[in-house]
UniProtKB/Swiss-Prot annotation:
NCBIfam families noted in UniProt: murC
GO cellular-component term (any): cytoplasm
Single Gene Ontology BP annotation: cell wall organization
Protein name: UDP-N-acetylmuramate--L-alanine ligase
Gene: murC
Record-listed E.C. numbers: 6.3.2.8
Family: Belongs to the MurCDEF family.
Keyword Ligase: yes
Length: 478
């Protein structure tokens, strides 16, 4: 049946039921929450229960554990994440019933039709930059909609339907899906070699994808680009769109000067166009987070947010889940008191930035790292860089690679990585199996006063939270 549509409410009434396959993912759950708030009847399936699925259920979504063809019956549209296999029973049933199927990024693009889109891309820093941008626009009274790949701690959610005209969202380059978006403003934080398996193991194709991403801006759109990153600077020089640059470079349109780290905060002078300046205290550690804040400040300034409002947003920022989260101090059975930091970093560049932030704020402490490598392909592709950066810490415990659906690759596991680190002669890494084993092994490595970084994109975050709440008890201990 062909239904006549006149406005957004007509769309909801005509096609009210939307089903998400893999609804527990960070990107999927955020879109689902926005659509719930818009008035859609949202259902979804996932193999595991998590914070996101529980939140969606509390908001009225119907959540199913596991995947079944019956889950999609009666729905008007099926949204799928890139992690869903082609033989998924729900996807196959949707095809057989000729139910429209939308990739996650395509549905995000549909939401952008009803707002003015700001897309945040880059190999590293997307989640924090998106969150900071949403915070700046909110402080400026613009009430944005946001869809973030992590939990914005102040909101207790990774998405919100705002009343304003702007939508701020992460643009995922990992599988090229960011090329489905048509924003009015695009941020690129940096361009690095990651997810090469989706680009034919050819970095030139990654570079070309980011160039095409900017080409999707309208002629009146704006590219907000970090020229401290050489790849982004090269792209800025040749992109045929309006550019606002940011960074610590003297040539940047929006820049930070007099940058000083004070524990878990950064203090700097924010230089804006037209000779405007503002003293800023950023409630996040590390020079990489200063760059993330500059991107948010650039967008805020462009949209008329006052400099003092930008500063208030940055100082009051409560953080994002698993991005240098200070979980507090825990005492081992032997009496050693250690501070635990939980972080999502899983690429050598991210590890290096987090290590620098930790040493900048706690230079007097021993830096102990528990790291769970993520994906065999990334471990293989970045093997030498991982070995180099992990060799720089005072003590290291590695859990086995979190496969994320990949099959093992010879020479790309944690034991091989430990051998490479050991050969450098600077540390003696300890290797465990599952991340859950870290709770019982770490006390033998830790000393009083240590700073413990627990890092990785797999399930190590749950282990960090368990230790912070329950102490250093092995899995299954009372």
């Amino acid at each position: 049946m062909i239904r006549r549509l006149h406005d957004t409410n007509d769309l909801v009434r005509a096609f009210p039921r939307v089903h998400f396959v893999g609804i527990g993912g960070t990107g999927m759950s955020g879109i689902a929450e926005v659509m719930l708030t818009l008035g859609y009847e949202v259902s979804g399936s996932d193999n595991a229960d998590n914070v996101a699925t529980r939140r969606l259920a509390s908001l009225g979504a119907r959540i199913m554990r596991g995947h079944s063809a019956a889950n999609v019956l009666g729905t008007d549209c099926v949204v799928v994440s890139s992690a869903i296999r082609e033989d998924n029973p729900e996807l196959m049933e949707a095809r057989s019933q000729r139910i429209p199927i939308m990739p996650r990024a395509a549905m995000l693009a549909e939401l952008m039709r009803f707002r003015r889109g700001i897309a945040v891309a880059g190999t590293h820093g997307k989640t924090t930059t998106t969150s900071l941008t949403a915070a700046v626009l909110s402080e400026g009274g613009l009430d944005p909609t946001f869809v973030i790949g992590g939990q914005l701690l102040a909101a207790g959610a990774n998405a919100k339907l705002g009343g304003g005209q702007w939508l701020v969202a992460e643009a995922d380059e990992s599988d090229g899906s960011f090329l489905r978006l048509n924003p009015l403003m695009s941020i690129i934080t940096n361009i690095d070699a990651d997810h090469l398996e989706n680009y034919g193991n050819d970095f030139a194709r990654v570079q070309a994808a980011f160039a095409e991403f900017l080409q999707r801006l309208p002629f009146y759109g704006l590219a907000v680009l970090c020229i401290d990153d050489p790849e982004v600077a090269a792209l800025a020089a040749r992109t045929p769109r309006h550019v606002m640059s940011y960074g610590m470079s003297p040539q940047a349109d929006v820049r930070a000067e007099n940058v000083v780290q004070e524990g878990s905060r950064m203090r700097f002078t924010l230089r804006l166009p037209q000779g405007t300046s503002q003293e800023v205290v950023l409630a996040l550690p590390g020079r990489h987070n200063v760059l993330n804040a500059l991107a948010a400040a650039a967008v805020g300034w462009q949209l008329g947010v006052a400099p003092d409002a930008i500063a208030r947003a940055l100082e009051g920022f409560a953080g994002v889940g698993r991005r240098f989260n200070d979980l507090g101090e825990v005492t081992t059975a032997s009496g050693a008191k250690v501070r635990i930091i939980d972080d999502y970093g899983h690429h050598p560049s991210e590890l290096e930035a987090v290590f620098a932030a930790a040493r900048g704020g706690w230079a007097d402490k021993r830096l102990v790292v528990a790291f769970q490598p993520h994906r065999y392909s990334r471990t293989r592709d970045q093997f030498d860089k991982f070995a180099a950066v992990l060799s720089s810490v005072d003590a290291l415990v590695l859990s086995e690679v979190y496969p994320a659906g990949e099959e093992p690759i010879a020479g790309a596991d944690s034991h091989a990585l430990a051998r490479a680190i050991r050969a450098r002669g600077r540390s003696e890494p300890v290797v465990v199996g599952k991340a859950a084993e870290l709770a019982s092994v770490l006390p033998d490595v830790l000393q009083d006063g240590d700073l413990l970084l627990m890092m990785g994109a797999g399930d190590i975050g749950a282990v960090a939270t368990h230790i912070a709440v329950e102490g250093f008890k092995g899995e299954g201990e009372a």
